Amino acid sequence: MGDPFMKKARQVLFVIVILNIYLSIVSWSDITSATMETAERILIDFNNTDEKENWQIINDDVMGGVSQSEIIFNDTGTATFQGRISLENNGGFASTRSKSHSYRLGGYNGLHVRIQGDGKDYQLRVRTDNRFDGISYRYRFATQPETWMNIRVPFSEFVPVFRGRIQSNVSPISPEQIQQVGFLISDKQAGKFRIEIDWIKAYK
């Protein structure tokens, strides 16, 4: 039989080693989490009641269409953009966007959005000026019905467009100049639509 003292010592040593490994993993997880938090910045938080005054609706009625939409601020701290797309009178789009604000995103690499959709395709849009019309930068994404998604979009993947047409002679987006953020549905997707947005962040 072995020495009982040595056996006990080995058991204690084993416990100490396992404990140190566990603490190392926990500490690294905390560091990683903290790094992720500092690498992202919240741009739009619908828990903030001030956001209710910062969003506007722009539909195809500006060109004679009859599509309808609204943005609803939920008690859960999210916002719902919903409505109905009509193709009558050559219409077919609805959108919502934030009012002009200088976000000062120099040094950031892209946008991170948490969203729940309805299975239709949407566009995340940003603008670098405060004009009602003009150049915007879009990123197309598909949604899954009643499924929350995290969408990370590098600024390099935003495409400059004017009234739905890609502009090849426009400079790439300048993060430092971004002033408006929003969502748009088009592409002849007639009928009801609905997306729910939790937040919009910028990431490095």
Question: Which residues are covered by each model-predicted region?
Answer:
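Bacterial N-terminal signal peptides
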Residues: 15-24
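Beta-rich carbohydrate-recognition modules and glycan-binding surfaces
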Residues: 7, 24-204
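Bacterial N-terminal signal peptides that target proteins for export
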Residues: 5-14
